[in-house]
Amino acid sequence: LKEEHADNAYVTYPFGFAKSVTLTAGAQAKVGQALNQARQADTRRSLEKALGPVDQLLGGHSDYQAANLQRFAVRPMTLAEARHDHTLIMRKDRITGTYARLFADIASIIVCILPTIVIIAYCYTDRRAQVRPTMQAKAMGTPKWLVTRYAASVAGLLIPVLMTALLLLGRVILLYPGAALDYWAFFKAAGFWVLPTLLVSTAVGFLSDALFSNFTGFALQIGWWLITMMIGAHQVIGNYGWLLIPRHNSLHNVSFFYAHYSELAINRLGYTLLAIVFLGLTMVLMNLQREGKYRGFHLRPARR
């Protein structure tokens, strides 16, 4: 806080992304007073009381809100902890696993929202071109038709993820020549960590198109994405739980990953099953559409 106050350049994290904030002279004076009070704080409660106004002046989502004060409680790793961390990186991660987690963290942020946009736009284009009635009239069952399109969409959207994984693997190989690397780490991370999020966001695209027949589903997915990002921002170096985007934005904290691996596995399995449920609901709606019993839920302004 002392450095940020001196530079009048504060960092907040609305929606999980860094934002620079500059304060007025009056607000700067209030931060200076809060800084003096924080220096004299000898309990967490008094520290929260001193720094709470700073968070309010910055518009919230800063390191100075009560929920984030534990970030200031830092201690050096002991020699035993450092050796354990190093052993996990070298023997279990085999170096590439460490980078693969960071890759999966960032890739998941992207695939949580982008596939929904692509699929809704894809379905909207079909509707504008009046392709949907022709396809629905053909003698192909709804399950086969939907699963084929879904699988093709997932495969197409996964290709850029795999290509990025390949490029990053090559970079790590160049950084650590002769090291015993796990050459499959990035691809395992793509399948285990990133793919379930991709499956859900793709399924949301098809479901929202069947449900609304417009771009309403995109707004709903943005809301889900923002909520997930804000929750995950509280602990980006290791936060799994039931987040659609499990966070591990660090090359370290390896012990946390292996200690919570089962939690992450349950999370990924749960979202894979959720994608299947969304696909099943889409199938039901599409059957109703083919039978002429449902034409989509449309939001219209109220008549005067």
What are these regions (language model features)?
Residues 1-58, 81-116:
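Membrane-embedded or membrane-proximal helical elements that form or frame transporter/channel pores
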Residues 1-22, 86-91, 95, 221-304:
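Terminal transmembrane helical anchor/hairpin motif
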Residues 53-115, 121-122, 147-214:
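Secretory targeting signals
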Residues 119-136:
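Transmembrane helix boundary and interhelical loop/hinge segments in multi-pass membrane proteins
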Residues 124-128, 167, 171-179, 212, ...:
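Membrane-interfacial segments
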Residues 142-143:
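Alpha-helix N-cap/start motif
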Residues 208-228:
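Functionally important transmembrane alpha-helices
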